[in-house]
């Protein structure tokens, strides 16, 4: 069990992708003082110490893999707890929920909560990013016409521009900007993706190079780099994708979510190495898995 003092000691490394502020009394007090409506949104008139302790307990639950508890504790505080709650809920949905309908419901719940409370959390890059992340994951699995009808691509592009402006060293945001164009190509094809949304291989390379230079050694970022190369280039970048997936699989995880990411990378690495042995056979099914394009014959 992670203690509050251990949480503080390891916080900077745990959040090395984002440099997210530690929720101690000084930080939370300043946050509430500068955002009176945020303070008013906390249910049951909780004291400052209660809010701080609950936030820290929520993060402890997240880092030790108790995602449901972390989510519940975060939501019990209202919008100020959405950062840890959204992170926990999207992680559970993305890595552990096998049922498609339930997975989609979890992502949609995050989007609905964010839509209702986003005016309270403009300061919070964690909340904003994982609302984006839920939309991105949902967009991967629902049909292209629905994605287009809801203008998800435009909303996600705008969210990333704003996040990058506010937090230019955020590794999650930089990686997402690279993955975004690859995801568009995966969903719509190269021609439609380029003509409609300007998706390009250069964007993938540009943002992942920025991530690489920051050298944070985050398994999920390496995993997503590998996936993006395959979505954008297919077999041409299979060996490079394998290198990035291997890197992801060899990271020593520091907490529960990273352990899930490393485990997932190891599983995908085995698949990709088998595909490589077969000279690319099976790659189309790999790339289109869990999408509405899964059963269509073209790459």
Question: Model-found features: residue ranges?
Answer:
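Long, repeat-rich segments with strong aromatic
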Residues: 203-260, 271-277
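Short coil/turn linking the two alpha-helices of tandem helical-hairpin repeats
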Residues: 91-100, 136-147, 183-194, 226, ...
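Alpha-helix N-cap and loop-to-helix initiation/capping positions
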Residues: 101-105, 147-151, 195-203, 236, ...
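Alpha-solenoid repeat scaffolds
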Residues: 80, 84, 96, 184-188, ...
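A cross-domain feature marking catalytic cores of carbohydrate-active enzymes
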Residues: 90, 175, 223
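Eukaryote-skewed repeat-based solenoidal scaffolds used as protein-protein interaction platforms
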Residues: 118-129, 134-192, 201, 206-214
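N-terminal alpha-helical interaction modules that lie
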Residues: 1-140, 153-167, 242, 247-299
């Amino acid at each position: 069990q992670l203690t509050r003092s251990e949480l503080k000691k390891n916080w900077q490394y745990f959040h090395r992708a984002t440099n997210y502020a530690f929720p101690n009394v000084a930080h939370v007090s300043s946050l509430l003082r500068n955002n009176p409506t945020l303070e008013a949104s906390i249910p049951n008139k909780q004291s400052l110490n209660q809010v701080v302790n609950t936030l820290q307990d929520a993060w402890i639950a997240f880092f030790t893999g108790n995602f449901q508890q972390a989510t519940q504790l975060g939501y019990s505080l209202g919008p100020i707890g959405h950062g840890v709650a959204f992170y926990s809920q999207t992680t559970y949905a993305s890595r552990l929920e096998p049922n498609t309908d339930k997975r989609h419901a979890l992502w949609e719940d995050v989007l609905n909560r964010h839509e209702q409370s986003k005016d309270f959390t403009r300061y919070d890059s964690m909340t904003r990013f994982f609302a984006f992340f839920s939309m991105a994951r949902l967009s991967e699995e629902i049909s292209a016409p629905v994605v287009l009808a809801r203008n998800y691509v435009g909303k996600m592009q705008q969210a990333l521009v704003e996040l990058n402006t506010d937090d230019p060293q955020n590794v999650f945001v930089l990686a997402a900007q690279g993955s975004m164009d690859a995801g568009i190509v995966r969903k719509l094809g190269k021609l439609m993706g380029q003509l409609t949304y300007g998706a390009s291989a250069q964007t993938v390379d540009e943002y992942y190079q920025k991530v690489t230079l920051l050298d944070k050694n985050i398994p999920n970022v390496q995993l997503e780099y590998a996936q993006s190369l395959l979505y954008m280039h297919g077999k041409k970048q299979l060996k490079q994708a394998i290198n990035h997936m291997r890197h992801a699989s060899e990271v020593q995880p520091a907490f529960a979510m990273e352990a899930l990411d490393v485990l997932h990378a190891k599983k995908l690495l085995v698949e990709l190495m088998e595909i490589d042995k077969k000279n690319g056979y099976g790659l189309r099914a790999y790339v289109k898995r869990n999408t509405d394009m899964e059963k269509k014959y073209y790459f």
